[in-house]
Amino acid sequence: MMEQGGTAESRIKAVIGAWADAVRRHDLSGILAHHEQDIVMFDVPPPLQSRGMDEYKKTWDLFFRYHKPSQAFDIEELAITAGEDVAFAVAIVRCGSGTFSGPPEEGGFLFRLTLGLRNIDGDWCIAHEHHSVPSTD
């Protein structure tokens, strides 16, 4: 499906890229820029879920304590499925620094990312964000 300014997939990829770049720079307003006000996020550290922009904003305080602007926050293996009004994207995120194979306290780590997006008046907005790591059992 072609939209003004490119395909839905290319526009969503640009939104996700801008979000990841804002995370790397610790730019909170850039992080929030493409999110809906009633965002729902499921994250790895508590709380189990964050509902609404105010709660979502608070989650970044903890992240910024451990992630330095010079460290990785790289989107890999991005796959986007887009319809006219809704889309989802899945990816692996490389976060931090170090080996990326050990626990977070050893440096970098990988996590799974799932995003749910809605097309609102021609702009793709993130309505749901889910971060997860596999069980280590």
Question: Which stretches of residues belong to each language-model region?
Answer:
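A beta-strand edge to alpha-helix "cap/lid" segment located at domain peripheries
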Residues: 2-30, 40-137
